[in-house]
């Protein structure tokens, strides 16, 4: 494809009237050679309304001797008992890991990935491998797009959403949410927005 484009540019440069100057051709050649490729390892969801987390499976790998997370050795992990839980979490018979690092205080026997960076065991809720203080492990739910809640509070990406009503809270998509009194975007109140009528229009 690059050869075809350069060939066409060279032909245009030779036409009467000089539709393209030789300098333009050289610039185009330089652009064609130096234009960067899209980084296939870049996170395509690096924004507040997208899911910033791994696919449900596939980031952990292992051979006969070691476990790896995205090419980096997971120190101390047991190859024989290791399981990928999804969302960056994994565990062996003794330890829970998040993105290859130990999750302190997590119970291996009851730990589960909830999605969106959240996980929990029978006693504690975690966000990105850190304890989410004050959250009820028994009743905590991940609602999507970074939002989670228990019967007493709402959180967004591990931070409490001040004043949000858990009982009426609803995640709407694309970072938007509402309760009976307010509308939120990425965990922040949208001043003046009406929760009763707020909606995300369909795309045409």
PLM feature spans:
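Signal peptide processing junction and immediate N-terminal pro/mature segment
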Residues: 18-29
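Positively charged n-region of N-terminal signal peptides that target proteins for export
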Residues: 1-4
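Non-catalytic tandem-repeat scaffold regions and their flanking low-complexity/translocation tails
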Residues: 28-204
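Bacterial N-terminal signal peptides
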Residues: 7-17
